[in-house]
Structures are given as structure tokens and as C-alpha cells.
């Protein structure tokens, strides 16, 4: 059993936010040690040609020892190095004067900030008061340090009236011009996000076709198709999908439970526990599609799942891949009691 590359991401410290769009899901913050990180990394090393190690999978750099952990992530990785993926912590940007300078020095040039409208809506969706003002302040601090902010806006029926106001705010702040001053581009994009984890709870308020009048046309390309149209495509689709790859990414919780990063952390994706079962059994479960999620994707045609879990009359908008993940999760939730 030898993979080409394995990526492992541990939830060492958790997250300061409880965002209502979080596709991973909500659970308690952990307090894993550096020894735990080393133990997990060393457990995987013999099963892969290269190993990419991350000490977080929710909020990057939330741990007070973030600098040391980044060094350890690099040291524990095998034949490769961890990446930043345009991700930082706006929570830390507002509390640590050294943080953005450090981020620039390790190569970060862009960082994605997430908004849900103006102050009240963004604070509500992030799950803590003051989040909106922290995002605006983080934008200013990034610009001062020649890191380009990218604004992503999550849209639902309850915040769509604020989208154009947020776009106007980005123009008032001259973000496009400010980024050009140091050779970067400002990007703002709008989407609903996936429909798994916490975001699945927002299914009822997903935008529909008639809501598009409230969004400038240049942002339509990320908003997808009506559910009824996707239903019509998939109801005739007999395909199944093997989710096993030679480059898997695994999430390890603070309790050492392992899940693939395909979608949210849910019981039907559980692969085992490193301490209780050992890495060999976890990987064997993955390779042989033993979780209900992987097994269903491999054995049940998507048309059978959409038939019982889709809505052929719905005008809600979805990206096609996100819709398929939503259907698989819903199917598994309905069937896990039969395991």
C-alpha cells in the first residue's frame, strides 16, 4: 500500500469563528500538541512517496505558536512542502502586529476574505460580533503590507439586498487601484457556496433565478443552474464515481478521527481512528470504499440518489458538482440508520 502523495491536515486548535456557511461543519476546538502532530505525520510516512503536512484544517494560524507550527509542518512533510492557498487568519491579523509581515516573508501575496453583506449580516454569519469591522481592518492592513485582498461574498435570499452595497464599498476603498500600486489585482466574486456542512442548513434560503436582478451580470458565472435543470440532467445519469485517488487528503480531528476532505465531516465519511485502529486500517477503509459515503458514490447511480433526494420543481441555484455532493450527503443521511 503506497500512495503517490498523501496530504494530512490536523485540527490542532480549531477556529475562532462559527460561520454559517462552513462546509466542514462545527465542532469543539481541540488542543492537540506538537507531539500529536509528529505522531500523526510519522504514522503516515511509510505509506506514501510524498507527504504534505498541515497543523490546521479550519482556521490557519489560529494557534499562538503559528510560526513554529509552520516550520514543523515543513519539517514533517516528505518530498514536498505545504502551501498557503491564499489563506490567512483575519482574526490574527487584527490581534498580532507581526503576523502579516511574517506572512509576506513566507511568500503570501493574496488573501481571501469572506463577507456576507454589511456589518449586521456578516457578524451574524461569521458567528461573532465585530467580524465585519475586523474584515475591513484586515483589508487595510493587507494593503499596507502589499498583500492583495480578495473579497468573496456569499449570497442567500436574506442578504442579497446588501450585495451591491458591498461592491460599492470595495470601490469607495479604491481596492482595485490600491492593489495595482504593488503589481497585484483585486478580485471580488459572488457565489452561494456549496450545500454541505453548515451551509446545507441554508438550503431553504438559497437564491433562485428571480433573485438575479439584485446581482450585477458580471457575477452570474459562479451562480450555477436551477435545481430542476440539474435534476433533469442527473435523473438520466447512470454513472457512479470512485472517490479513491492516489493523492488523497485526510482531515484528522482533535480526537484522531479521520475523514476524507471530499465534503463535510459527517459519520457516513468516517474512515477510522488513528490511535484506536491504526493508519493501515484507516487507509484500507479508504482504498476499499468502506465508508457509507464512498460506498454509495461507487455503487449507487446518481440517478437513483437524485430520484429520492432531489427536487424536480426547485428553482434554487447550484453549481453542478456542489449539487451532486449535496445529493450524496442527503442520501447517506437518510440511509445511515440501516448500517
Regions found by a protein language model. Give the residues of each.
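Radical SAM enzyme [4Fe-4S]-AdoMet core and its adjacent flexible, acidic
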Residues: 32, 116, 124, 128-254, ...
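Alpha-helix initiation/capping motif
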Residues: 33, 88-90, 118-120, 128, ...
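Residues that form generic nucleotide/phosphate-binding pockets
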Residues: 43, 125, 215, 282-286
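Flexible mid-to-C-terminal extensions adjoining Fe-S/redox cofactors in radical SAM and related proteins
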Residues: 257, 261-339
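Conserved glycine-rich "GG(E/T)P / GGGxP" loop and the immediately following alpha-helix
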Residues: 7-13, 21-181, 188
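General structural signal for secondary-structure boundaries
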Residues: 1, 25, 33-36, 89, ...
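N-terminal pre-core extensions flanking Radical SAM catalytic domains
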Residues: 1-28, 249, 279, 318-339
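Extended interaction regions within the primary functional domain
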Residues: 40, 45-59, 65, 73-80, ...
Amino acid at each position: 500500500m503506497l500512495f503517490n502523495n498523501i496530504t494530512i491536515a490536523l485540527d490542532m486548535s480549531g477556529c475562532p469563528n462559527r460561520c454559517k456557511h462552513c462546509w466542514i461543519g462545527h465542532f469543539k476546538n481541540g488542543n492537540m500538541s506538537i507531539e500529536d502532530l509528529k505522531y500523526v505525520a510519522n504514522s503516515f510516512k511509510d505509506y506514501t512517496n510524498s507527504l504534505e503536512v498541515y497543523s490546521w484544517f479550519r482556521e490557519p494560524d489560529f494557534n499562538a505558536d503559528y510560526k513554529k507550527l509552520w516550520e514543523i509542518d515543513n519539517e514533517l512533510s516528505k518530498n514536498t512542502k505545504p502551501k498557503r492557498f491564499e489563506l490567512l487568519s483575519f482574526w490574527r491579523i487584527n490581534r498580532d502586529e507581526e503576523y502579516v509581515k511574517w506572512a509576506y516573508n513566507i511568500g503570501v501575496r493574496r488573501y481571501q476574505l469572506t463577507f456576507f453583506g454589511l456589518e449586521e449580516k456578516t457578524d451574524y454569519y461569521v458567528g461573532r460580533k465585530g467580524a465585519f469591522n475586523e474584515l475591513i481592518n484586515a483589508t487595510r492592513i493587507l494593503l499596507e503590507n502589499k498583500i492583495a485582498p480578495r473579497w468573496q461574498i456569499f449570497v442567500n435570499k436574506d442578504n442579497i439586498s446588501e450585495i451591491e452595497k458591498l461592491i460599492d464599498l470595495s470601490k469607495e476603498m479604491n481596492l482595485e487601484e490600491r492593489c495595482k500600486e504593488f503589481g497585484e489585482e483585486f478580485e471580488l466574486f459572488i457565489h452561494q457556496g456549496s450545500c454541505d456542512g453548515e451551509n446545507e442548513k441554508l438550503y431553504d434560503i438559497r437564491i433562485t433565478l428571480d433573485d438575479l436582478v439584485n446581482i450585477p451580470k458580471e457575477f452570474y458565472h459562479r451562480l450555477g443552474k436551477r435545481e430542476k435543470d440539474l435534476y433533469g440532467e442527473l435523473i438520466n445519469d447512470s454513472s457512479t464515481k470512485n472517490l479513491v485517488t492516489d493523492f488523497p487528503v485526510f482531515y484528522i480531528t482533535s480526537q484522531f478521527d479521520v475523514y476524507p476532505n471530499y465534503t463535510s465531516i459527517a459519520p457516513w465519511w468516517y474512515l477510522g481512528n488513528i490511535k484506536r485502529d491504526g493508519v493501515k486500517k484507516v487507509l484500507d477503509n479508504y482504498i476499499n470504499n468502506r465508508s457509507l459515503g464512498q460506498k454509495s458514490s461507487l455503487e449507487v447511480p446518481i440517478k437513483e440518489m437524485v430520484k429520492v433526494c432531489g427536487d424536480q420543481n426547485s428553482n434554487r441555484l447550484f453549481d453542478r458538482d456542489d449539487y451532486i455532493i449535496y445529493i450524496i450527503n442527503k442520501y447517506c443521511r437518510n440511509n445511515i440508520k440501516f448500517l
